[in-house]
């Protein structure tokens, strides 16, 4: 019987499935951070349980840490408590932790692939909704809640119902200036933020295959933003080249054997998907969100939609509410919207490829006077090291940006990088919900190049018309 890649991955990890019961899956890799793990470890202690397989769980510090200081003793309040608890729990359990004193530390979904902890064919979980990022490697990766974090620590398994399968095909090649972020925002714009609910999505098409691993991670990272459980890209030579010689990747004959197996990880030609979505790559323009969810997105060459022209009453009401919050009028040209802050970072767009794209725009230019602050936050210590080796940090600083240490930063209002009330931000992150970047902050999601251009010109501009250096 023909199977999709998702079905192959799921079936290969079923430990036990009783009639009428939810299957139990084996979990190959468990990634943890300081926010969703403390209660899980407390639960283990109360129950008198140990971590079952310490070699399959790895920790990092990312969400609540400061991107300005590397000393845990200089953290304040809840952030300090969370970081200290993670360090204590990992040490007591024997779990490997990439803390703030190591260059391997970084955002969990950047650190995992960099270290070769993310491999094709794996099941990967983390107490974080953007765990779908790791699906770019042909791994079944999804976010879990804190009680499930405890269960995986204790058993290395998880009850998991089968999802439906969705195929998203992006046909042909994108035009110059169009990035992975534009591709996935265009997908979400077409499907809406609920279009993938109940599905695991596999991304297909020439435009997807042309992407680097960094680009594929961006696409899979935002699968959750149109409701999908997980996102997948079948592994290929691009995948293998990225993983070869990573610290935790197989070596020698084990590598050769692994690659032979990984090559089988693809949907069968006659596999049937429950849902299919098709986009033409040539039609995708640089994307900018105009509302308060990632599905409220248009091309930079378009105007803000008019809710009065929307037939569906729910969509209309949502658009009216979004525009009231975001402070825009219908039919506003997206290129006439000024920004107060710019954030380049997050698990969506903080890898070296993203920083190079931003630097190409910012080189030889200066931050616009109306832009109060530009934060450039690398996704890991290794990304930071590579960027500095290439001189990208100097480009950012000379342009008027702040070059920070690794962390989740302004993606979410959980640390000391936040928007002021009603400030408008061009952000490379993944969510533009109300208050996501700070109380009453207004977020517009864009690619790294588009964010950099907004910083230099003080408003959204079409990156296709910006000379790169």
Curated annotation (Swiss-Prot):
<dbReference type="InterPro" id="IPR033941">
    <property type="entry name" value="IPMI_cat"/>
</dbReference>
<keyword id="KW-0479">Metal-binding</keyword>
<comment type="subunit">
    <text>Heterodimer of LeuC and LeuD.</text>
</comment>
<keyword id="KW-0411">Iron-sulfur</keyword>
<dbReference type="GO" id="GO:0051539">
    <property type="term" value="F:4 iron, 4 sulfur cluster binding"/>
</dbReference>
<dbReference type="InterPro" id="IPR001030">
    <property type="entry name" value="Acoase/IPM_deHydtase_lsu_aba"/>
</dbReference>
<dbReference type="InterPro" id="IPR004430">
    <property type="entry name" value="3-IsopropMal_deHydase_lsu"/>
</dbReference>
<feature type="binding site">
    <location>
        <position position="411"/>
    </location>
    <ligand>
        <name>[4Fe-4S] cluster</name>
    </ligand>
</feature>
<comment type="pathway">
    <text>Amino-acid biosynthesis; L-leucine biosynthesis; L-leucine from 3-methyl-2-oxobutanoate: step 2/4.</text>
</comment>
<keyword id="KW-0456">Lyase</keyword>
<dbReference type="GO" id="GO:0046872">
    <property type="term" value="F:metal ion binding"/>
</dbReference>
<dbReference type="InterPro" id="IPR015931">
    <property type="entry name" value="Acnase/IPM_dHydase_lsu_aba_1/3"/>
</dbReference>
<dbReference type="GO" id="GO:0003861">
    <property type="term" value="F:3-isopropylmalate dehydratase activity"/>
</dbReference>
<dbReference type="InterPro" id="IPR018136">
    <property type="entry name" value="Aconitase_4Fe-4S_BS"/>
</dbReference>
<comment type="function">
    <text>Catalyzes the isomerization between 2-isopropylmalate and 3-isopropylmalate, via the formation of 2-isopropylmaleate.</text>
</comment>
<feature type="binding site">
    <location>
        <position position="408"/>
    </location>
    <ligand>
        <name>[4Fe-4S] cluster</name>
    </ligand>
</feature>
<keyword id="KW-0004">4Fe-4S</keyword>
<keyword id="KW-0408">Iron</keyword>
<dbReference type="InterPro" id="IPR036008">
    <property type="entry name" value="Aconitase_4Fe-4S_dom"/>
</dbReference>
<dbReference type="InterPro" id="IPR050067">
    <property type="entry name" value="IPM_dehydratase_rel_enz"/>
</dbReference>
<feature type="binding site">
    <location>
        <position position="347"/>
    </location>
    <ligand>
        <name>[4Fe-4S] cluster</name>
    </ligand>
</feature>
<keyword id="KW-0028">Amino-acid biosynthesis</keyword>
<keyword id="KW-0100">Branched-chain amino acid biosynthesis</keyword>
<dbReference type="Pfam" id="PF00330">
    <property type="entry name" value="Aconitase"/>
</dbReference>
<protein>
    <recommendedName>
        <fullName>3-isopropylmalate dehydratase large subunit</fullName>
        <ecNumber>4.2.1.33</ecNumber>
    </recommendedName>
</protein>
<comment type="similarity">
    <text>Belongs to the aconitase/IPM isomerase family. LeuC type 1 subfamily.</text>
</comment>
<dbReference type="GO" id="GO:0009098">
    <property type="term" value="P:L-leucine biosynthetic process"/>
</dbReference>
<keyword id="KW-0432">Leucine biosynthesis</keyword>
């Amino acid at each position: 019987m023909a199977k999709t890649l998702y079905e192959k991955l799921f079936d290969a990890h079923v430990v036990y499935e009783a009639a009428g019961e939810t299957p139990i899956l084996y979990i190959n890799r468990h990634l943890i951070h300081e926010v969703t793990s403390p209660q899980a470890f407390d639960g283990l202690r109360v129950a008198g349980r140990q971590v079952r397989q310490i070699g399959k769980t790895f920790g990092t510090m990312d969400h609540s840490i400061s991107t300005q200081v590397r000393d845990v003793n200089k953290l304040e309040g809840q952030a300090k408590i969370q970081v200290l608890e993670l360090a204590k729990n990992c040490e007591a359990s024997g779990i490997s932790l990439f803390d703030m004193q190591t260059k391997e530390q970084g955002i969990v979904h950047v650190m995992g692939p960099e270290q070769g902890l993310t491999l094709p064919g794996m099941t990967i979980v983390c107490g974080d909704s953007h765990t779908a990022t790791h699906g770019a490697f042909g791994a079944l990766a999804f976010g879990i809640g804190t009680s499930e974090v405890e269960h995986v620590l204790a058993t290395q398994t998880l009850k998991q119902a089968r999802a439906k399968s969705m195929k998203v095909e992006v046909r042909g090649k994108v035009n110059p200036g169009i990035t992975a972020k534009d591709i996935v925002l265009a997908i979400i714009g077409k499907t809406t933020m609920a279009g993938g609910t109940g599905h695991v999505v596999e991304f297909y098409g020439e435009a997807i295959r042309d992407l680097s691993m960094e680009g594929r991670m961006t696409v899979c990272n935002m699968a959750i933003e149109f409701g999908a459980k997980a996102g997948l890209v079948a592994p290929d030579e691009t995948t293998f080249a990225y993983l070869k010689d990573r610290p935790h990747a197989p070596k020698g004959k084990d590598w050769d054997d692994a690659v032979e197996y990984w090559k089988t990880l693809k949907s069968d030609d006659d596999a049937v998907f429950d849902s299919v979505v098709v986009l033409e790559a040539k039609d995708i323009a640089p994307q900018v969100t105009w509302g308060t969810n990632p599905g409220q997105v248009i091309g930079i060459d378009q105007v803000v939609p008019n809710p009065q022209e929307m037939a569906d009453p729910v969509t209309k009401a949502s658009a009216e509410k979004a525009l009231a919050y975001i402070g825009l009028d219908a039919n506003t040209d997206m290129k006439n919207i000024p920004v107060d802050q710019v954030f380049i970072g997050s698990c969506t767009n903080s890898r070296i490829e993203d920083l190079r794209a931003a630097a190409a725009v910012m080189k030889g230019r200066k931050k616009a006077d109306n832009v109060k602050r530009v934060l450039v936050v690398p996704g890991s210590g290794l990304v930071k090291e590579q960027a500095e080796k290439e001189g990208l940090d100097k480009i950012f600083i000379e342009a008027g940006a702040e070059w920070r240490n690794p962390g989740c930063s302004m993606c979410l209002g959980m640390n000391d990088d936040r928007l002021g009330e009603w400030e408008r931000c061009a952000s490379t992150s993944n969510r533009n919900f109300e208050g996501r970047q700070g109380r009453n902050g207004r977020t517009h999601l864009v690619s790294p190049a588009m964010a950099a251009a907004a910083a230099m010109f003080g408003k959204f501009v079409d990156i296709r018309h910006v000379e790169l250096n």
